[in-house]
Amino acid sequence: MALLQISEPGLSAAPHQRRLAAGIDLGTTNSLVATVRSGQAETLADAEGRDLLPSVVHYQADTLRVGWDARQQAAQDPANTISSVKRMMGRSLADVLARYPNLPYQFQASDNGLPMMLTAAGAVNPVGVSADILRALAERAKTALEGDLDGVVITVPAYFDDAQRQGTKDAARLAGLHVLRLLNEPTAAAIAYGLDSGQEGIIAVYDLGGGTFDISILRLSRGVFEVLATGGDSALGGDDFDHLLADWLREQAGVADRSDHGVQRQLLDAAIAAKVALSDADSTVVEIAGWQGEVTRAQFDALIATLVKRTLMACRRALKDAGVSAEEVLEVVMVGGSTRVPLVREQVGTFFGRTPLTSIDPDKVVAIGAAIQADILVGNKPDSDMLLLDVIPLSLGLETMGGLVEKVIPRNTTIPVARAQEFTTFKDGQSAMMIHVLQGERELVQDCRSLARFSLRGLPPLPAGGAHIRVTFQVDADGLLSVTAMEKSTGVEASIQVKPSYGLSDAEIAGMIKDSMANAQSDVGARMLAEQRVEASRVLESLQGALASDAALLSEAESTAIPAAVEALQQATQGTDPAAIEAAIKTLDAQTQDFAARRMDASIRRALAGHSVDEV
């Protein structure tokens, strides 16, 4: 819903005065800013008429260049020219170096392990570099709209995790921007197309940008945009096409020295120019490092065929998650400049069996959708029939006894969402509980990703099972998770907002989902074993307490049979057969039934001692 403006009684709320809002596509390779003017969403160009702003920043001791000017410095001064910084957002230095070992920057670790790049202007980090890009886009919007922005919607890849999303918000704050919402890039594209067409059905959004690939399966119904499933790869995009072609050109040109960053940049620029030319022509001529040769579209297609196939495998997984087939998809929306590559369009069309939609510039469609959403959220539209539902990529839950995972919010649940479950204590007199928040699809804690831990203290010292703790998981519209635990009788409460230090890539998410499928049967067996061991532990602990207080109530036969049944259960718990443990529990239960009945009678007699029948 739109954000409402409230005025003092007797004063006009100036409904005719539009608030200034913008949608920002903060991309890996290029970024854009768009707004709604005269009812139409449009991207805003710079003084030279260029809509795209290269996501590049060049740092010098006393100057800062962003965009095209910075990109021109990349070949001459690569160490001070930061590009594709979005790939580093929310990642540790070790992760960045492992994923991208050939980056021409001088790195150092910050106190929290995040990467810092040493430049002539000092140390900069991915959040600060992103802020410089956002600041340049905001200045462009301010000039075009002749005023400061009241709010922005910034798009992020669908699989950005909490740390990456929070980093984007922090960058916007540093740039002096008020973030109305972070919006998934494929969802923004759906807004750009769906509002105009108003059609209903299943739509696939294929987003292949400079550095990330996302596939989203959406259902459009009566103005409701629901994301059924998402998938992709945060380390796959047009940049990878460029690097493959650059490596091929290096071999053809006989360039052996990989340490010359200037030559590296020239090779990359030549590869980018060739890729663009091959989108319209069957061949193009390349001149680099004294070498001149021809590159054909067929040669380029052969280089990138494996990467394109990887995107289609992700599409197949997303369709399976959504529970739909390719034949059920009505339209395929193409997003990202890399979808201009003829092989990509051809392969995607073949996979889905229909010609992809490209009527909106694939470079601009995400920014346009973000601008439409920003215009609504800032309050320019008092109401809207559009409802937007994103999803979480992996299940969220917490650890229970025995190292088991209790899922509270399943994956692909629409957000924002809040879910709660009740838990209880395991031991008598337990006064504290450790809440361990987990992410993943497996049944055991050891196979899932730990997100956070916090303690709930001050529980009433009741018998096991006496305290009732309500744990609430809440995921906001930006995908950030908060967890609250409250003991119901006392109101004692503790909470935490999950903000992981490091990111989780699409490949790792896909791997976790794949592992859960591959290990489904063994996981079920492991869970059954763990559950029976927990139940056995509970039974043995309860019996130990009963024997400590009422051993005198045992019959002679029970004095022999019960210890034997206890030993049998203890031995069974050392094994790996849940059925054997369950059988041993039942045997022990049968051996202790009469003892339990005598304990109950004795307890009642003690309670009634000294009281008359009338008092009872």
Swiss-Prot record:
GO terms for biological process: iron-sulfur cluster assembly. Keywords: ATP-binding, Chaperone, Nucleotide-binding. The keyword tRNA-binding does not apply. SUPFAM superfamilies: Actin-like ATPase domain (SSF53067), Heat shock protein 70kD (HSP70), C-terminal subdomain (SSF100934), Heat shock protein 70kD (HSP70), peptide-binding domain (SSF100920). Transmembrane segments: none annotated. The keyword Transmembrane does not apply. GO terms for molecular function: ATP binding; ATP hydrolysis activity; ATP-dependent protein folding chaperone; unfolded protein binding. Coiled coil: none annotated. It comes from the Bacteria. Belongs to the heat shock protein 70 family. HAMAP family: HscA. Chaperone involved in the maturation of iron-sulfur cluster-containing proteins. Has a low intrinsic ATPase activity which is markedly stimulated by HscB. Involved in the maturation of IscU. This is Chaperone protein HscA. It comes from Serratia proteamaculans (strain 568). The gene is hscA.
